[in-house]
A protein has these predicted regions:
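Bacterial N-terminal signal peptides that target proteins for export
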Residues: 1-9
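Alpha-helical transmembrane segments
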Residues: 11-15
Length: 161
């Protein structure tokens, strides 16, 4: 009985070591204009070069012309309504007097990049994901995704230590 217990403890310890070896990393990329800022935050498995999640944060500065500010809010709300029921996607909104924003969190375990029904329902989301999430070898590759968005002038933000 003691041998079984000792063996179980050793095997359990080995399992925890293997689980701890997963090399999860995070990278942030920003594209900024005079009126907007888009931030992509990737969480990825460094060893497998596989994206685990993508968070897209969009902030748009509002015009002082009320009609333009209202039109911007309406466009954002249309996008949110398209996206809100897609599996693996969580969305949050922010609203202020000078800027509005929204954050889209994509869980790659649940999100279906090649689902025709979801693509038809939320074409704007999938157009963005086709830029930010690049498949390579039957998985969403971080290195291929990074290369693609850097060509579009997204700048990687280095962590300050």
């Amino acid at each position: 009985m003691k041998r079984i217990l000792k063996l179980s403890i050793v095997l359990l310890g080995a399992l925890f070591v293997l689980l701890g070896c997963r090399s999860e990393s995070k990278s942030v990329f920003v594209f900024q204009t005079e009126n907007s800022k888009i931030t992509y935050t990737y969480v990825y498995d460094k060893g497998n070069d596989e994206v685990l999640s993508l968070t897209t944060d969009v902030v748009v500065r509002l015009s002082e012309v009320q009609e333009l500010a209202t039109a911007t809010r309406q466009k954002r709300d249309e996008l949110v309504n398209q996206i809100k029921d897609i599996e693996g996607v969580r969305i949050t909104l922010s609203d202020g007097a000078k800027a509005i924003g929204f954050t889209i969190e994509i869980d790659m375990k649940k999100f279906k990049l090649n689902d025709p029904e979801s693509r038809a329902k939320a074409p704007s989301l999938y157009q963005t994901m086709d830029i930010a999430l690049i498949k390579k070898d039957d998985k969403v590759s971080f290195s291929a995704s990074k290369e693609n968005i850097e060509r579009l002038e997204f700048v990687e933000q280095k962590e300050e230590k």
